[in-house]
Structures are given as structure tokens and as C-alpha cells.
Swiss-Prot record:
It comes from the Bacteria. It is a peripheral membrane protein. Pfam families: OSCP. This is ATP synthase subunit delta. It is found in: Cell inner membrane. F-type ATPases have 2 components, F(1) - the catalytic core - and F(0) - the membrane proton channel. F(1) has five subunits: alpha(3), beta(3), gamma(1), delta(1), epsilon(1). CF(0) has four main subunits: a(1), b(1), b'(1) and c(10-14). The alpha and beta chains form an alternating ring which encloses part of the gamma chain. F(1) is attached to F(0) by a central stalk formed by the gamma and epsilon chains, while a peripheral stalk is formed by the delta, b and b' chains. Belongs to the ATPase delta chain family. It comes from Roseobacter denitrificans (strain ATCC 33942 / OCh 114).
Amino acid sequence: MSEPASISTGVAARYATAVYDIAKDSKSVKTLEDDINVLQGALAESADFGALIMSPIYTREEQEAAISALAAKMGLSATMANTLSLMAQKRRLFVVPQLLSTLREIIAEDKGEVTADVVSAKALTKTQADKLAKTLKASTGKTVTLNASVDESLIGGLVVKVGSRMIDTSIRSKLNSLQNAMKEVG
């Protein structure tokens, strides 16, 4: 991991832990989840919002005023709105995407859930997804939510990532291994 990425991940983790603890103490974890969904939707849909949190051009005051107005318009909880304002004051808004993903991980961990990123050559059927989730639940001991995507370059098979574990059963991976083995021999 590069140094800037590890720094922003560390900053995001500290804010996420603090926000989660506040939400848990005030029994508003569900509200926090709603805030995360709203903010992730805004980041995905609005390039201007992304530019606001990433750009060093805006002053602390401009960022804080804009974030406060946006938080009110989005209907964010006081905890999240105050956190974003504090992050603007400290010039830390650039870690908001990592903050949101870290918060999701903390909430899932607390609920005994885990998200598995599954990449397949073609879309999984409902039966296949259910069977895979059941198998992963037996392996991890946690409720598994699948985040499925399609990559036709895999040719066949799956690539499954659960936390730091990755299982690659794709045809592409097997062909690459075979190609490397042939290079070593010849």
C-alpha cells in the first residue's frame, strides 16, 4: 500500500471508529447506515460533490459551509453532519470515501456479517448465488452478502474475495498458470 493511501486509511479508520462508537452509544446505528447510503449515492451521482471533498482549492470555511448545507439538504443525522464539518475544519474531507467503506465494514463486523466480492464470467443465477453464499457462510461462520459483478475476460469460473482471502477458480487464471509453467520449461 502506498504511503498516502495508508495515511488516509488510518485517518478514515480513526474517524469511523469514533462515529460508530457515538452512533452505537446513542442507539442510532440504523440512522448511521442510512447516512452512509445517502453519502455513497451522492458520491456516485455527483461529480461536483466528489470535487468538493477532494479539491484543495476550496478553503476550510468554504468546504465547511458547503458540507453543512449539503448535510442539511440530504437529511443527514447530526452525528454525521458534525463529523463532516469537523473533517472540513481539519482539511480531511478527502478521506470520506474510505470513511464510508470503513464504517460499512465496522457495522457488518458488529452484526456478524461479511461482504464477499464475486466476479464471474457471466451473471450468477439466484440458485448459484444462494449456494455460494451458503458455502461461504459455512467457511467464514458469518452471514455473507454477495457483491457480484461480471468480467467476461475470466472465460469461466469465479474470483471470490472475502476480507483478505481470495479464491481464484477462473479459467483465465488457470491458463495464465499453464502459460507460466510452459515458459519455465521451455
